[in-house]
């Protein structure tokens, strides 16, 4: 009897976990279609640059409008800077806000970031008002900088 009760609880737990995952995916806003020829780039620093710990990063965008996250107009969005990210964030959820994913929801096109000495990678990821990546994602080339 105890085995049946444990199996029943395990089954209910697994079903609940699957339902929670399905609900989270269903709740994610749809991804906006990428405007034709939209690109983003890191204008400064250049790939391979040797920089101090306070790094001015300038963002570029072409064929898409940079706007605050409150602007929900089609074809607009804002930058996210990925710092030392191994891969892009999941496409079915908003870009997280943490030390690896910096949000620029006020429509900023540059920032000074502080990095510890060593090699670091930087990449831009452009998203809509809901912090969802476009479809397909609008990302810059990943660059590596050397911090003194």
Language-model segments: what does each one mean?
Residues 30-35, 48, 52-62, 70-148:
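Long, low-complexity serine/threonine/glycine- and acidic-rich segments characteristic of extracellular
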Residues 7-12:
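Classic N-terminal secretory signal peptides
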